[in-house]
Amino acid sequence: MSATTDLTTDLSVTTASVSAMTEGPEGSPADGPDAPGHSEHHAARLPPGITPGPQTLRAFRAVLANTLVANVTTSYLWFALTFWAYLETKSVLATSILGGSYMLLIAVGGIFFGTLVDHHRKHAVMVASSAITLVMFMLAGALYLLFPTQRLVDWNGPVFWAFAGVILLGGVVESLRNIALSTTVTLLVPDGQRDKANGQVGTVQGIAFMITSVFSGLSIGLLGMGWTLGLAIGLTALALGHLLTITIPEQRPPRDEGARPPAFDIRGAIGAIRAVPGLGALILFSCFNNLVGGVYMALMDPYGLTLFSVESWGIVLGVTSFGFVLGGLWVARFGLGEKPLRSLMLVNVVVALIGIFFTVREVWWVYAGGILLFMCVIPIAEAAEQTILQRVVPFAKQGRVFGFAQSVEVAASPVSAFLIGPIAQYGLIPYMKTAEGQERFGWLVGAGQARGIALVFIASGLLMLVAVAVAMISPPYRVLSRSYQQAEPPPAS
């Protein structure tokens, strides 16, 4: 359900020798890539000379601190744009298009971003991402100053979409940085500590989400979009300046002589995924879940804004996002255990039950409590998926695999977001206000302003619950569990 609120991805070693081979349990060299029976997924081999230790962990913590500033900035402006767009246009369709467009661009750019990450130093990729985001936000500021308010808020005109579009692009480029950060966890953190490192990243993202949820709503309600843009530009510049002072111990990725790497290396990503039995099925399962998750993405804010003022809704999101911090702290403290795939499935069961019950009646504390629980379990799911990929996929191909997985999984959300917006706006919401709608479904969803949206949430939760039950009894689930255990590095590493 990572795509549900675009809670962007959590961040996910064995010691590599000069020949890029690890030692076995008895100190003997492991089979090389060309040896019979060799399987690339038996360890996420690092480049020669890179050994996780105190220095690399310090670099990881510095990157993590910078991620906090960057995530605060991007989330702050993106949340503010969503609130501003709905309040000014009063259109569920407009907010659905914005959310769907964001996820669509993330999906289209995933493979390209992943290829860039694998073929360049991770620090350089992060710097480029932050710089592009800064330029986009500055362009949005220029548009805000150039055009009058009545043209900016007319969602039927080009100015509104140009203004929202450049902010959207600035947020999309952040996913390039997130893919790079996922691979730096593999690079900088020893294998046995990666699940806890992913929990730390979840904690940081939860803190960022909590801060921005509160201040985005307050900023739009009290300061307006102009000051909000100015603050976002300043924070982005601050994050970029800090990032330039960080050093990541890494080497330039090797390149084939005379060969130009493809911009979209789909073949390399698919090859790495096929090398791990069951991994493709996990990605397809996440894709289906995100198809259902697009409903949450499209309708969670409109439903919340029917129960709360924009200022109150921002505070509710800020308070409930503390659950995201708690979930990340739990993983950082206790890890995921020996079977992260099982943890991932159980979390999806909880998410499905939340979708069924948290809008069953139009009661603010039920909705807020459901969001709080949702925030608690999402970091566990994110950390589980990241930890699995970081162990079973070779480091040299992780960027492409993360990017490909992002593209495939996230591509489902815009489909449902684009579909459910018009269906809710012009179909279910008006229908549930009629006597016929109340007579047919009133026993289930009760009475209120947004019973049509509640009906969509309930149906989506039931669909997800069935999908998880089927997945947990399927052969690919058992195969991938074995693949993860077989990929465990020997104790000597």
Regions inferred by a protein language model and the residue ranges of each:
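Cytoplasmic helix-loop-helix junction between adjacent transmembrane helices
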Residues: 166-207
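Flexible cytoplasmic inter-helical loops of multi-pass small-molecule transporters
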Residues: 41-44, 244-268, 480-490
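C-terminal transmembrane bundle of multi-pass solute transporters/carriers
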Residues: 3, 38, 96, 108-112, ...
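Helix-loop-helix hairpin linking two adjacent transmembrane segments in secondary transporters
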Residues: 153-159, 205-243
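Intrinsic disorder in cytosolic terminal tails and internal cytosolic loops
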Residues: 2-55, 473-493
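C-terminal membrane-cytosol helix-exit motif in multi-pass small-molecule transporters
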Residues: 140-141, 173, 177, 234-253, ...
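Helix-loop boundary and gating motifs at the non-cytosolic
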Residues: 44-107, 271, 275-320, 421
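Helix-loop junctions at membrane interfaces in 12-TM secondary transporters
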Residues: 142-166, 358-371
